[in-house]
């Protein structure tokens, strides 16, 4: 892989991490596709297309809000990856939606699994620390596991971008035009 692609993957990791950290300070909503698309456009040198793709994906993910224990599709991953590949391949916003929805669903599935295993372990560690009266350790574990969770998801996005470039390009070329332009 080229050095330029690696640098873009690192920058997209940072964009995704910023998006995932929206819930760390309360729900700031800066993980929404419009914000993520704009930041991806800034990183890749095409802010206008980033805003257009982000706006389109915002409509697609309009109702994707976690309520209670529900975990909607991961719009951060969907927006970052779809915007990046749309900008790099020169595809249109219809193709961005075609890429974003399955990516968002797959990353949400991964997130559910890692929450079941990794964050459950962190919860047990917090329980033990609380039982021993070590509240500083509870806070430390909670912060590290929360930030680690977000970093893991951002890493997944960056790796998906870095290693998935050729796969996404093949997918974009394979998808029939009526699928990507179905809502025109």
Feature annotation, model-predicted:
Residues 1-72, 76:
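Hydrophobic transmembrane alpha-helices
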Residues 2-8, 15-18, 72-91, 129-137, ...:
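Transmembrane alpha-helical segments and their short flanking loops
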Residues 15, 22-27, 57-61, 93-100, ...:
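Aromatic-residue detector
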Residues 44-52, 90-103, 131-136:
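Hydrophobic alpha-helical transmembrane segments
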Residues 55, 59-126:
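Hydrophobic, small-residue-rich transmembrane alpha-helices and their short perimembrane loops
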Residues 98-181:
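Helix-loop-helix junctions within the multi-pass membrane cores of secondary transporters/permeases
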